[in-house]
């Protein structure tokens, strides 16, 4: 089964994915992004690749902070890109910025745990 990044388009979709991650005991990695954010566009292909590499082990979500502002505000997003890791419905880790090495390490750390 190939991986894929799930685009969150509503608070309800966000809540459903957090519940799914909790139910399946899978970590969720979220990319908080914006269409106008250059660094976000640069790291997006890596995020997509990681979703394939960790298919079945990790749930990958993408949240456009302008399209789903309520989710971004609730998550306390102040800069893009910001990556959050959720485990059992609770934020477990985060990364601010478009560092490819740090993003790879973040996903690997939580996929193995």
Swiss-Prot record:
One of its GO terms (cellular component) is cytoplasm. The active site is at residues 37, 40. This thioredoxin cannot be used as a substrate for E.coli NADPH: thioredoxin reductase, but is a substrate of spinach ferredoxin-thioredoxin reductase and can activate NADP-MDH. Pfam families: Thioredoxin (PF00085). The gene is TRXH. Disulfide bonds join 37-40. Its main location: cytoplasm. Keywords: Cytoplasm, Disulfide bond, Electron transport, Redox-active center, Transport. InterPro entries: Thioredoxin-like_sf, Thioredoxin_CS, Thioredoxin_domain. It comes from the Eukaryota. Participates in various redox reactions through the reversible oxidation of the active center dithiol to a disulfide. The H form is known to activate a number of cytosolic enzymes. It is found in: Cytoplasm. Belongs to the thioredoxin family. Plant H-type subfamily. The record marks 31 as: Deprotonates C-terminal active site Cys. The record marks 38-39 as: Contributes to redox potential value. This is Thioredoxin H-type. Residues 2-112 form the Thioredoxin domain.
